[in-house]
Amino acid sequence: SYDNSHPFIVETDLGNIKVYGTEFNVRRYTDEQIVRTTLVNGSVGFQSKESVTENYVKIEPGYQISYERGEDVVVKKVKVANEIAWHKQLFCFERCTLEEIMKDVARWYDVKVTFDNENLKGLSFTCTLDRYDEIEKLLRFFEEVYNIEFKIEGKHITIMEQ
């Protein structure tokens, strides 16, 4: 909506996002206790369900509001293109751990991912990958960058050192 005089509210279980005329992205998954709103252009505000005031935290384009239950609202500058890459059917990760990446991969491909070695979770990647590639092709990228291997058994993927 580009009508600033008639904002609308996007409600989540963690808080409300007031939209004042804008292009924005909301990321909220039931298996995570965090909601994120990224502003592309226009204006949005956020108010947690736990807030004792009527005030909304407002952000400018290029910023993201993150809120985790019981914590403070966090505002940070982000690369908007990374946050809305899914519009272009891409995964876009910048300095993300393999654990963070595999959460998104598991959700998208509807698979369960386990790590054979806890140290592998912290491996860091910056990459852009096609969401519609076969999962084997996507995982091959990670195998080529680090000395890791993916064992696929049906809907279960185990990540291990080579």
Residues covered by each model-derived region:
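A residue-level detector for the "anchor" residue at the start of short, highly conserved motifs
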Residues: 1-162
